[in-house]
Amino acid sequence: MIYAEILAGGKGSRMGNVNMPKQFLPLNKRPIIIHTVEKFLLNDRFDKILIVSPKEWINHTKDILKKFIGQDDRLVVVEGGSDRNESIMSGIRYIEKEFGIQDNDVIITHDSVRPFLTHRIIDENIDAVLQYGAVDTVISAIDTIIASEDQEFISDIPVRDNMYQGQTPQSFRISKLVELYNKLSDEQKAVLTDACKICSLAGEKVKLVRGEVFNIKVTTPYDLKVANAILQERISQ
């Protein structure tokens, strides 16, 4: 089976003085997360679409889904975990409980606050994860990347041609991700907050899928202004 998992577990601390997590803030009068969910609903390859939400916001998540989308049997709201990877695993535990996990089952995970992903990005993630087992969505680095080990002085300037900026979706063969995650110590789980890094450090090849510059993550007030500008431009076309 092919699952989508929309990660809406963040609290939005970088958004400033707002009274709700950033995924629920309005983007052209509709919550950001609704724009994201709709992109996945448009793809009929998904058997289930999981939305992972903070416990205290589960009812709100269900309410806005009902208001803006209506009934869809593919949609399921699941309680998130203490961090990103634990939220991914919360969704996987739900899948295991309800459907069991087959060796060829895959999951396409995506930030709820990246509302501008495209049908191409989703389809290429599905195709690539079915073939390779682990996938990351990236764009080429435009600016020079500076590395500093002490946050005071330059330690290294990597060759920009080899540098990429990570986006989402990140996609995985479920059985392999579970196997690798369960091998981690508590200390490793606290440090390895990116699921693709878990795969890479274990020697698994992670296939790259080309993202888009406009596939932005809305985490700050400035990002929200940019997102509104992108949306208004599309509406006016």
From Swiss-Prot:
Keywords: Cell wall biogenesis/degradation, Nucleotidyltransferase, Teichoic acid biosynthesis, Transferase. Transmembrane segments: none annotated. Pathway: Cell wall biogenesis; poly(ribitol phosphate) teichoic acid biosynthesis. Its EC number is 2.7.7.40. It catalyses: D-ribitol 5-phosphate + CTP + H(+) = CDP-L-ribitol + diphosphate. GO terms for molecular function: 2-C-methyl-D-erythritol 4-phosphate cytidylyltransferase activity; D-ribitol-5-phosphate cytidylyltransferase activity. It is an enzyme of class 2 (transferase). The record marks 14, 22 as: Transition state stabilizer. One of its GO terms (biological process) is cell wall organization. CTP binds at residues 7-10, 81-87, 112. The record marks 160, 217 as: Positions ribitol 5-phosphate for the nucleophilic attack. Signal peptide: none annotated. Coiled coil: none annotated. Belongs to the IspD/TarI cytidylyltransferase family. TarI subfamily. HAMAP family: TarI. This is Ribitol-5-phosphate cytidylyltransferase. It comes from Bacillus spizizenii (strain ATCC 23059 / NRRL B-14472 / W23).
